[in-house]
Design a protein with these regions (language model features):
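C-terminal binding/interaction regions
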Residues: 6-8, 12, 89-143
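A short, Lys/Arg-enriched amphipathic alpha-helix followed by its capping loop at the start of a domain
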Residues: 19-27
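Mid-chain, well-packed structural core segment of small domains
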Residues: 63-109
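Short, high-confidence coil segments that cap the C-terminus of an alpha-helix
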Residues: 2, 57-59, 100
């Protein structure tokens, strides 16, 4: 696994974020908040995670909001982020193998803790296949 993994959420993802930190104690988490179930704005926390990756504090990140949709959209507004929304292990694996995703988004109201844990483990331990997928990922930089 990686040295540090950034994790951030809004209020809809707070419970799952905390559960993942307990379920995966061997991960060196860089917790960027939020730190309660009080209502906050997901773009703020997607931005904090994107900034941490850009600064080299973490190579990959996990983002969680209620559905995973809003926070993934916000993350992908940052040019150096390739955020994929996944609610199953297949999506978590393929976003690494084919798309070299550096951020995994999930919905705290959409996915159970056990599946989320599996998704994070697969995401962190799957390598990018490169090859024919590399030219496609390279084209993302010109969008």
């Amino acid at each position: 696994m990686l040295d540090a993994v950034a994790i951030a959420c809004d209020h809809g993802g707070f419970a799952l974020k905390e559960a993942l930190k307990v379920a995966l104690p061997d991960v060196q988490w860089l917790d960027l908040g939020t730190n309660s179930a009080d209502s906050v704005d997901y773009p703020d926390f997607a931005g904090k995670l994107a900034d941490a990756i850009k600064a080299g504090k973490a190579a990959r990140g996990i983002l969680i909001c209620g559905s995973g949709i809003g926070i993934s959209i916000a993350a992908n507004r940052h040019a150096h982020i390739r955020c994929a929304l996944a609610h199953d292990v297949t999506g978590a694996r393929l976003c690494r193998q084919h798309n070299d995703a550096n951020v995994l988004a999930m919905g705290g109201r959409m996915i159970g803790e056990a599946v989320a844990k599996e998704c994070v483990e697969v995401f962190l331990n799957t390598k990018f296949d490169g090859g024919r997928h590399q030219k496609r990922v390279d084209k993302l930089g010109s969008c």
